[in-house]
Amino acid sequence: MSHRNKALVAIVAGTALLISSGAAIGQAAIADERSGKAMQTLNVDFATETGNFRGGASGTLYGLGDDGSPADAILDGAQVENSSQKPPSGTQHPSGDALALENQFFSNGGNELAVYMQDYYPDWSYNSGNRPSDSRTYVLDVPVDDPSYGTYTNGGDGVWDYEQVTEIVINKVLANTEHPDQYTFIPFNEPDGGNWYASGDNASAKIFRTFLSDWDSEYKLIQKIWQQYKNGEKPSKVKPTADHARVAGPGDCVYRQNRSSAFLSHAKSQNTLPDVFVWHELGKESLSSFRSHYESYRKLEKKYGINPIDVNITEYGELRDMSVPGQLIQWQSMFEDEKVQAETAYWNYAGNLSDNMARANSANAGWWQFKWYGDLRGAQTVKVSSDYMNKADSLQGIAAIDRTNKKATVLYGGANDANADQVKNDGSNIPVTVHLTGLDQNLFGSTVDVEVRENAFTGPDGVAATPRVVNALSDVDISSGTLDVTTTSVDRYASYQLIVTPHQDRVLSIDNAAAGRALLVEEVENTVLSGGAQTYIKTPWGDGWNYFMTSGNGDVGSFKTGSIASWTVDVPADGIYRFQVISGNTGFPGDNDVSVDGQSAGTIHFGAELAMKPAAKWLYRGSGEVLLRLKQGQHQIQLHGSSMDNTLDKFLLYQVSASDNSLDRIEYPADQFRLESGALLTYDQDGARGFASLNGGEAKLFAHAWESGYHSVKVVYTASRGDSMVLSVNGTSVTTITAESDGLQSSMVNVALSEGINKLELSGDAVSIRDITTCRDAADDSNAITLEAESLQLAGGAQTRENSASNASGYSYVTGLGKQFVTEESGAFGMGDQTRVVTLDTNNTPKIADAVRGTVTIPAGTIPAGKFNMVVRFSNDAFIGKHDYNPQIVDLGLQVRDGTANGEEVARGAFRYTYSDSNFLERAMTVETSGSALVLGNWDEPGVGAGAVSWGVGPNLDYVQFYPVMVGDVYHQSLA
């Protein structure tokens, strides 16, 4: 297809230039002495436990956009512990409705959902920054599910407007939620700043006294309504059982010592103490000052005789931190040390975990950091110390010990040249020694295995592959209880996962050319530039909250037609390689041609990136990839500029083919599984030490796929003949694997994976798994059925559109599915530059065009009966309202019905914003078909459902692909 270039061009090797990427395997890792960088040390004392792993720093603000956005695999993998979202009918943002997404959130690792109650208001600051008066009359005397409930007319009724807003919000949540006890209500957001009660830290100000009075009335009203539902006075789906509603506050934009002191004293006297104490730590300075703020707060509790209250930093970090694992680990370690919850700030759009995922279903490096952090659930944290404690942009870490699985983990990153933040390329090639003490031989035995994985920064929308093993130590003596593990950091913005286990019955190796997993990396500003392309030096400190981090603190711009970036690279082995470019643009898809040693080698197709505000243009970076066939030795890879005028940050060259001709082979050992419901790592069976024993539970793996299609999944395990386990992919049972022999063996099956992150689950009883290996098997893609949307039966408002500037296959696609919004052109002022903004009525409700619903029908017999992974290539540029800094995007809904438009719904999904209607992404759904016709559209009644997808508007469609979830039989092999 025209949008996806899979051609491979054979290139003959030239002279050599070695680009180092990782550390050596052996009994002791050695730092790269050529770097000339001073070694930094992170001290980890496993003998000093600091408490249960809290896991609260994986919170987000508006990290979820709607039910299904993000997809389950992304959400479950990230283990988002808490999230703050908007209230039902809230108009501050058009998506992120708590009720719409609660079931998905709580079924994928979520524990606590908070409601920003003031986000009921459409404007920022709320109500123009002024405390509301009594200027509206709200409709409250009808059932909560009546469409008129909560609407208003101008003119007062003797009741404070916000009191009525509170009643609306709490009633809508408690009447409809299925998880009332897991909600927290936040009545005020940044009251000390521009929202109604601004007085800085002046606790004597009259307006602050007004705030205290309003806090009391809000708190008591929330509790009153809670009791009405708990006692059954008001009808609800599920009755609350907790003694009282969880309320959080005060919600200041920074830590305020005087206001916090006065607030605690007052709230204690009035019995209105919050269940969660909330403030924000947004600036980079917070990496230095948070611990002192936290200590000051706890001293206030002691001063007033208050038992410790949970703390949630409901907004943390800047754009320079989001998607950057070496930054995120610094925040997470700080919050985990103090056992508090914390939520990444909401700087861009809802539904992408605060820029910590890529595309529609892929990981960026921020996602892998969230995933690693979430993997620590159930463990005990231990003491970690750094020479740079309370220093912004420095080496920090988290360490934990899982005694059940005999696994010790250290997450670390942020190493920086003598903390000199203005130095170009600071942080690259710094050797970091993790000094481990207190390793208990009673737990680990006399020798251990160690693996270190590297998670390198790829930009907010750049795809990050499964982190590679860059250091491995096998059968290392720990008789002294001490071990030093030194790894050279490729990038100060990378993070690292170090795992220690008892010596295992498997062969450890680093991901290098011998393993078919080599990776070569270069900053584009270090390549040879010509044709007007220029290097732009960046400072990691940036110029405020809206600064995006740049790999290597520099990038290349002015990259236009005639420009070339030339990279001389030494390829370690013959084979296929994936050339990835981290790049930003102006909000439209485009292409860059690639040549190798002067020969045309293909084209990289870049998708559009976020560009609706000046801070994001060219700087909100994604990635594009092309496959190259290269010979061992030196080559010159050239990227050619075009009219796209994109910026370039980093080049990466991934080895795709291994010596056995397997493609994109990734081995996931058992210590990388997430083990649940009784499954655990065991070390007491000879020949199976370090295997995951299922024990009636399950082993869960989050596997990366560069593209949708068939992948072989090979499971190596021990079992007795006849023992079985069930393999599920993305929540769908695929097959039962039954052992055909006794002892060590493997079973392999070809399954359909989606582009991005896939959740693989193995459940069973008497089976112990050593590892799971995935490999691309494109030959089986011939089993898929691909249907161009414009070739199908269109009805209603659905129509074909031609657009030569799009990245749709054949440059044509279908628009008009479902209903359609009434839209108007918008310029940069409304952050709708190059997009169309949905028109709102006086109640800030989107206007829906009076037109026939559009549908696309796949004729009967086209798709046989069966279970399929349905890949949808779509675009969505829906944009509702204006905001000072948040692009007001929404997800759109697509449903599939069996037989006719009135038939049974067999699939449903939320489809994210794609930056432009001409920019198409992939998202997959599982569908079970009967062989009848399939009708695609959006039949939701506008405004009736909870979330934005319920407005009845569908995305644009390029094509749909139906992959049978499994092809062929299970292939077994005895390894005994």
Curated annotation (Swiss-Prot):
UniProt-annotated location(s): Secreted
Recorded GO MF terms: hydrolase activity, acting on glycosyl bonds
Ranges of residues in domain CBM6: 519-654
EC number in record: 3.2.1.223
Coiled-coil portions: none
Catalytic residue positions: 190, 315
Annotated GO CC locations: extracellular region
Catalysed reaction, written as an equation: Hydrolysis of beta-L-Arap-(1->3)-L-Araf disaccharides from non-reducing terminals in branches of type II arabinogalactan attached to proteins
Residues marked Important for substrate specificity (site): 116
Position of the signal peptide: 1-28
Top class in the EC scheme: hydrolase
Protein's UniProt keywords contain Signal: yes
pH dependence: Optimum pH is 6.5.
Homology family: Belongs to the glycosyl hydrolase 39 family.
Reported function: Hydrolase involved in the degradation of the gum arabic arabinogalactan protein (AGP) and larch AGP. Catalyzes the release of 3-O-beta-L-arabinopyranosyl-L-arabinose (beta-L-Arap-(1->3)-L-Ara) from gum arabic AGP and larch AGP. Also cleaves a small amount of beta-L-Arap-(1->3)-L-Ara from sugar beet arabinan, but wheat AGP cannot be used as a substrate. Can also release 3-O-alpha-D-galactopyranosyl-L-arabinose (alpha-D-Galp-(1->3)-L-Ara) from gum arabic AGP, with low efficiency.
Name this polypeptide is given: 3-O-beta-L-arabinopyranosyl-alpha-L-arabinofuranosidase
Species for this entry: Bifidobacterium pseudocatenulatum
